[in-house]
Regions:
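Signature of N-terminal electron-transfer/Fe-S-associated modules in redox systems
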Residues: 1-160, 164-186
Length: 186
């Protein structure tokens, strides 16, 4: 019996047609499997390998290399909080402390008692100009404050399942440079 639904397996089988190299489909395929199950089981990785006609060791290698793939159960809503230098200097540690207290966990990766939330500290999400920031349910959230965290938690407690991503984040545009670049005269 398959652990992945027929619909997800069909989506996975269609992925290679979207990429110039067949193997490039493995990450979106693993993402589909994880979205359906909540995390990647050995059986799910095997089914992804079979559906993509790839070596199971390759699929497992990709799943274990990238931190956004999970091999054990996580909360329904996963907070990835950037704690790299830019975010740390703008309050990421306070955001992490507030989040941990609000969801009732003590460690990175721990699941809240109600099973709804987990968090993980990550090195960089590529939006330093919006620090502190995080990714939640495939969406980026910027300029975080404890109040924004509380609002997101309240919203997610009402949500039956994580929303599918539509765009990258909150619609923010990067700040313009503080001064214009000039060509060096040579």
């Amino acid at each position: 019996m398959s652990v992945l639904s027929a619909h997800v397996l069909e989506e996975i089988r269609e992925l290679p047609d979207k990429y110039p190299q067949h193997r490039s489909a493995v990450m979106p395929a693993l993402d589909l499997a994880q979205e359906e199950l909540g995390y990647l089981t050995p059986e799910a990785m095997s089914e992804v390998a079979t559906a993509l006609q790839l070596d199971p060791g390759y699929v497992e290698g990709v799943a274990t290399f990238y931190t956004l793939f999970h091999l054990k159960p996580i909360g329904k809503h996963m907070f990835y909080v950037c704690t790299n230098l830019s975010c740390m200097l703008r309050g990421a540690n306070e955001i992490v402390d507030h989040l941990k207290g609000a969801i009732g966990v003590h460690e990175d990766g721990e699941v809240s008692k109600d099973g709804l939330f987990s968090y993980e500290e990550v090195e960089c999400l590529g939006a330093c100009e919006f620090a502190p920031m995080m990714r939640l349910d495939h969406r980026f959230h910027y300029d975080l404050t404890p109040e924004k965290i509380d609002a997101l938690l309240a919203e997610r407690r009402q949500s039956p399942s994580p929303p599918r991503a539509e765009g990258q984040g909150e619609g923010r545009e990067p700040a313009p440079p503080m001064r214009k670049r000039t060509k060096k005269s040579g």
